[in-house]
């Protein structure tokens, strides 16, 4: 089974650089405490690393 990542926006993007805002938007997060599920792949991992201080990540098995 493929791993999935549950990503939750825990901190606001207000006052953050534009590249971080775009990364959060690309992950599909718009509101605080919103959670999205993505497949675990290098592209998603790279985006998470870029905004790791703004999100909480949990691995789930499906």
Swiss-Prot record:
Q: Does the keyword Ribosomal protein apply?
A: yes
What biological processes does GO assign it?
Answer: translation
Q: Does the keyword DNA repair apply?
A: no
What are its GO cellular component terms?
Answer: cytosolic large ribosomal subunit
Keywords of the record, alphabetical order, are:
Ribonucleoprotein, Ribosomal protein
- Family, similarity comment: Belongs to the universal ribosomal protein uL30 family.
Q: What is this protein called?
A: Large ribosomal subunit protein uL30
């Amino acid at each position: 089974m493929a791993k999935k990542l549950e990503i939750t926006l825990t901190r606001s993007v207000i006052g953050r650089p534009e590249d971080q805002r775009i990364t959060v938007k690309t992950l599909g997060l718009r509101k605080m405490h919103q959670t999205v599920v993505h497949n675990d792949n290098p592209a998603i991992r790279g985006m998470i690393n870029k905004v790791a201080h703004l999100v909480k990540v949990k691995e789930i098995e499906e």
